[in-house]
Curated annotation (Swiss-Prot):
Its EC number is 3.2.2.27. Pfam families: UDG. The gene is ung. The lineage of its organism: Bacteria, Pseudomonadati, Pseudomonadota, Gammaproteobacteria, Lysobacterales. It is found in: Cytoplasm. Excises uracil residues from the DNA which can arise as a result of misincorporation of dUMP residues by DNA polymerase or due to deamination of cytosine. This is Uracil-DNA glycosylase.
Amino acid sequence: MTEVEARIQLEPSWKAKVGDWLLCSQMQELSAFLRQRKAVGARVFPPGPQIFAAFDATPFDQVKVVILGQDPYHGEGQAHGLCFSVLPGVPVPPSLLNIYKEIQDDLGIARPDHGYLMPWARQGVLLLNAVLTVEQGRAGAHQNKGWEGFTDHVVETLNREREGLVFLLWGSYAQSKGRVIDQARHRVFKAPHPSPLSAHRGFLGCQHFSKTNAHLQRRGISPIDWSLPPRNELDTTSAGA
């Protein structure tokens, strides 16, 4: 068992489906890389117990929607294991502000006073980054080190073993990762990334949130409540907050 396997435990339903990847040579190489970076003083985010937080929050059989991100936020205290999300009290990042703007325009839901998306995850929205770690101040520092193999395996397993999921693919990176998705089995919505650099090219106005709920309701599945409680009412259990 590698150090990472010993320290981080996958949620049981996910471990049964994709835990085999933790035993492969890619994981051993990734574990060695993470140890080496920490040995030279690199600050790795998110903290170890939160690396697999997306899986803890949304068990395999409870997934309704998948939002694919790229890699974690690289600022102090930002990343906590859910793509696009930050802990309560951390300033809302620009991409998430645009997500909130689209939700408001699409559904009339007012922007919340925080960037904590755990309530979505607990309803079945898997907030999955392609790369699960990063280093302070170095965006993309852990790309092409092995995480992509694991998260590809996650997407492929969902594609194969579930049916009727909604995949929200924002930006070329997410859309490339989502090429394996069988659109006869699942609903895929694509748009530019919500970053301020690209949101105006088609993310704003995409109506993905209402379209997602319409798809779920057509299948007899309860829709996602995209509203978020105010910060002073949040349940931050297991969030590291």
